[in-house]
C-alpha cells in the first residue's frame, strides 16, 4: 500500500466531519481525531508531491498572511502550503491597514475573509497553550 493510500485509510477512520467549512483558530479547541486528520491530509499531500502529482486544489486564489510576531519558519511554511495548493500569498502589513488605527485583528480578518480563500494568523498571545 502506498503512503498516500495509508494516509487516506487513516483519515477515513477519524471523525473530522465538523472541520469542513469551519475556522481553525485554536488547536486546543480541536479533538484528537481532528488534529490527527490534519496530519493525515499533510501526509497524503506529501505523498502526492513526492510523486510529482499536482496537489493544486485551486486554479487561482488568495492566501492572506497576518503574522503579528516575527517569524521565518511559520511565514515560509504558510507561503509554501499556499503555493502547494495553488494560492497566491499576500502579506497583510498592519502599518498599512486599519489595524494601525485601532481596528482589531478579528475585524480585519472578517473583512478580508470575503476576498481570501485562507487566512494565516500568527499571534503569540497564548504562548504555551497549544493542544493539551
Regions found by a protein language model. Name each.
Residues 56-132:
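Phosphate/diphosphate ligand-binding glycine-rich loop within oxidoreductases
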Amino acid at each position: 500500500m502506498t503512503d498516500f493510500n495509508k494516509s487516506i485509510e487513516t483519515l477515513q477512520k477519524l471523525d473530522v466531519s465538523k472541520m469542513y467549512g469551519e475556522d481553525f483558530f485554536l488547536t486546543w479547541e480541536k479533538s484528537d481525531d481532528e488534529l490527527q486528520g490534519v496530519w493525515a491530509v499533510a501526509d497524503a499531500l506529501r505523498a502526492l508531491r513526492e510523486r510529482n502529482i499536482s496537489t493544486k486544489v485551486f486554479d487561482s486564489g488568495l492566501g492572506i498572511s497576518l503574522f503579528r510576531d516575527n517569524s521565518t519558519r511559520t511565514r515560509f511554511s504558510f507561503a509554501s502550503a499556499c503555493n502547494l495548493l495553488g494560492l497566491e500569498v499576500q502579506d497583510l502589513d498592519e502599518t498599512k491597514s486599519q489595524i494601525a488605527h485601532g481596528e482589531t485583528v478579528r475585524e480585519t480578518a472578517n473583512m478580508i475573509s470575503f476576498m481570501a480563500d485562507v487566512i494565516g494568523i500568527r499571534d503569540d498571545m497564548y504562548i504555551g497553550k497549544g493542544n493539551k
